Amino acid sequence: MSPARAEVDAAAGWWHGQHMTGDWFGARTAVEDRGVDLRGRWRGIYFGILDSEQGAGNAFAQELSFWLDLDAAKLAGWEGLRGLSGFVEGRWRDPGPEANPNTYVEADSLFNPSRYAGGTGWRLMNFGLRYAVPEFVGVKDGLVVTAGWLQPQKEFVTQPLARLFANNAMGSAEGLGGNIPYGSSFSTWGGVLEVRPVERLYIKGGLYMSYFNPTDPANRGLHFHGSRSEGNGLFFMGETGITPEFGAERLPGSYSFGGYFYGEDNEEFGGNKYGFYGQGEQMVWREDGEQGLRAFSLFYFAPPENNDFSFYTQAGLVYQGLVPQRDRDLLMAAVAVGQYGDAAAPSAGQSVFVEAGYQVRLNDWAFVQPFVQLVTRPAGTSAVGDAAILGVFLGVDF
């Protein structure tokens, strides 16, 4: 093989690989075989604000994330540790005002056009241990226990389709973040127990420490002691769900119902809070393989007396492979609506957020996603003007 041909093959292998940084000359595969999985990603979102309360403008938000996963059985070379793993995640988000489109839009934080506006700077997100019983009551991984410095958002109300979007309401907070610390910047001590009595049914519960102002950028995700002057409390989440397949095409779906109790009683927070939610994702039509149309929806209720939002709902559609020869591209559109509660401004009504986009998959490790966002009554009243945004969501996995 000529040197030129070898270079072309190497470039093609890199482009069609799993990571931008490649296989590290074989080192990545070697360490993964020993139970060490180290990976990272970069995300950037450009917001071209066409109109808003503060007029036209621009913003560019960025996030760098790093993960380290450890497989105890492979590390120790002992099969008796099969199912035990450790994990660590760290993150950086651009803290500058030029990164936050809400400088112009002035929306309630739940309806921030950017999912990367909270918990800025360097931040420790989570670390801990997870044990999945290899077989429990005849079900693979039928019992899973997780404990450590955790993020409830990664364990509950998981909607992968909603997290394709750039805005905060769908991509991170999922309604709950409008009333309690819940989104992608909230970390706390806790434990989660998940049981699958049968293959397609699960029941899980999580108990966490609640504390004052947990997503403050100044604490860097290191607020292990919680609040000293304000006092700590308990945060419980419970959820049950099913993962059925429908029809001759065996169209996959996921449906769940859950609730929470957030116990933190201080003057600023407004006392203990609770709420209930239900969500579903369903493939409704299959074109070929993974190609086809999927739908998702979520609803969330909370008492209006001490919550900013008494009701929130989101729904959307995602079509994979609509354009010929672009089998992995995604066409998406969704809407989110939040009804303000008594804890918000007395005159507040609803905010409505619409986002539509098209994700171009360049390869396994990079995408470009142009999108449009429309925000009606961004802060719940006509006092803040509507907003229109054109943007581009970029991603690279390394």
Q: Model-flagged regions — what are they?
A:
Residues 8-14, 28-50, 86-88, 96, ...:
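Transmembrane beta-strand segments of Gram-negative outer membrane beta-barrel proteins
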Residues 243-325:
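Long, well-ordered mid-to-C-terminal structural blocks that present hydrophobic/aromatic surfaces
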Residues 386-398:
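Outer-membrane beta-barrel "beta-signal"
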Residues 57, 61-213, 307-343:
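Outer membrane beta-barrel
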Residues 56-58, 230-231, 267-271, 301-312, ...:
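Solvent-exposed loop/turn segments connecting transmembrane beta-strands
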Residues 38-46, 86-92, 145-149, 203-209, ...:
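Transmembrane beta-barrel strands of outer-membrane/channel proteins
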Residues 4-7, 21-38, 71-86, 134-143, ...:
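Short loop/turn motifs that connect adjacent beta-strands in outer-membrane beta-barrel proteins
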Residues 66-68, 127, 191, 238-240, ...:
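Membrane-embedded beta-strands of outer-membrane beta-barrel proteins
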